[in-house]
A protein has these predicted regions:
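A short SAM/SAH-binding and catalytic strip from SAM-dependent methyltransferases
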Residues: 25-40
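A short acidic, Gly/Pro-enriched loop at the edge of an enzyme's catalytic core
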Residues: 17-27
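A short, hydrophobic secondary-structure junction motif
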Residues: 30, 52-53, 97
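Class I (Rossmann-like) S-adenosyl-L-methionine-dependent methyltransferase catalytic domain
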Residues: 1-17, 40-43, 57-147, 152
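A short glycine-rich, Lys/Arg-flanked "PGG" loop and its adjoining helix->strand segment in the class I
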Residues: 42-54
């Protein structure tokens, strides 16, 4: 496509520097930032926001602390020992508050929760943040919509 001018492969923290500030219409994170601890995620996100144009959109999906395999005593970044994320390396888990805090530089347009559960436990829960870069500081807000898909 002639609209894609540049593609980079590698670590966000390094590759974002090769793009001009205020040049992205949108950034879509499909559960890749959650492979970084909170501090590195903040650093990546701060760089990413600089690349968004005013009014640019940011979509991010993250792993919920409600998922089977999350262990609160291990903090929010660890390698799960059970559940669907075993043998995937260390992952960061969030809740609504921590994700909105991470992305506080953006106006929150919507906040969704996508849940997959059986009769015994939540097997998968993804948090989806939809934000927009504005000319002012963080705006907060947002709407929560829950959708449960049950296996019976």
């Amino acid at each position: 496509n002639d609209k894609i001018k540049q593609i980079e492969l590698g670590d966000y923290i390094d590759k974002l520097d090769s793009f001009k500030d205020d040049s992205f219409d949108a950034i879509i994170d499909v559960a890749s930032l959650c492979c970084n601890d909170r501090e590195k995620s903040k650093n990546i996100f701060t760089k990413a926001v600089r690349k968004l144009k005013k009014g640019g959109k940011f979509y991010s999906s993250a792993l919920s602390k409600q998922v089977f395999g999350y262990e609160a005593d291990k903090g929010d970044f660890f390698e799960p020992n059970h559940g669907i994320y075993i043998k995937m390396g260390s992952l960061r888990f969030d809740d609504e508050k921590s994700l909105k805090e991470l992305y506080k530089e953006l106006k929150c347009i919507n906040f969704y929760t996508q849940t997959l559960k059986d009769k015994q436990s939540i097997k998968e829960e993804i948090l989806i943040f939809e934000g927009e870069k504005s000319s002012t500081e963080a705006m907060g807000g947002g709407i929560i919509k829950n959708k449960a898909l049950e296996n019976e």
